[in-house]
Amino acid sequence: MDRLDAIAYEDNLIGNVQQLAQQVKEGTYRAKLVLRKWIPKLGGKLRPLGIPAIADKLLQLAVAKILEAIYEQDFLSCSYGYRPRISAHKAIKDLTGELKSGKYHVVVEADIKGFFNAINHDLLMDMLVRRIDDKPFLKLIRKWLKAGILETDGQVIHPLMGTPQGGIVSPILANIYLHYVLDMWFEEIVRAHCTGHIYLCRYADDFVCAFQYSKDAQRFYKALIQRLARFGLEVAEDKTQIIEFSHCKVRAKTKFDFLGFEFRWGVNRWGKPILKRRTSRDKLRASLVKFKAWFQKHSGLPKKILFAKLN
């Protein structure tokens, strides 16, 4: 579960991989316990970090690649997170372009509360069955969902919800879940019931929806709460808001954060509306704290080496 385990596994890599393949083929493979460590976050909170066994990581990588090949043709253009050749930078660029168009006047900024730990296993498996009829393949995924979590105090927890902690397969499973829960629903149902322009930009469980009309945004938000509840999810109220966001109302000085950037309307030197974007204050503060800790740790190094590390 650590660097030493990886080195030991690599010493007999071919033999270990062959043994793993044989276990999968014979149906004797068992997912190992996932070691969970707690990492400090800004503000004194802790976040869990799952560390799967090396063999499980390798097998999950193979399964993730297969899922990617199946679902990339299904995923919609509004989904940006954890996809090949699609980055957070593209999400920011596309969102900026849409907002600059002037078609939208209201923004719903939303985040799903504890999303990765709240995914319903049975509902996720039902979604996978829609596209995959290979029972042994699906059984592998079920094993990882149910794999025990080993706490640092020796306690073993068997999760009833959520994607595999620290698992390579977790991001694409999360995308598949929200593809059905949010993306398709937004494009097929929400769009049909709105009277104006609408737009969705989602990166994992963080998303922004833009609307031409306030009444559409208000109806959407009410429907969103009900929709998420059907799948065992809820919005994080402290990270969710409905705001007027229009080039026609620059004086409102409204703003929202998405993927580490703050968006707001302002005016240029000629007094014309302009969409402004800058690093969000929370993101900047976190980066400064991280840099300060790094600098204190390395301040004793010679300047030449220190500057090389900074570059």
Regions found by a protein language model. Give the residues of each.
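Structural motif
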Residues: 50-54, 58, 132-136, 168, ...
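Conserved polymerase palm-domain catalytic core
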Residues: 16, 23-27, 32-33, 37, ...
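Short helix/loop capping segments that flank catalytic or ligand/cofactor-binding pockets
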Residues: 48, 59-60, 117-119, 218-219, ...
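A conserved non-catalytic segment of reverse transcriptases
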Residues: 146, 235-305, 309
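Non-catalytic, polymerase-adjacent accessory regions of viral genome-replication enzymes
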Residues: 1-13
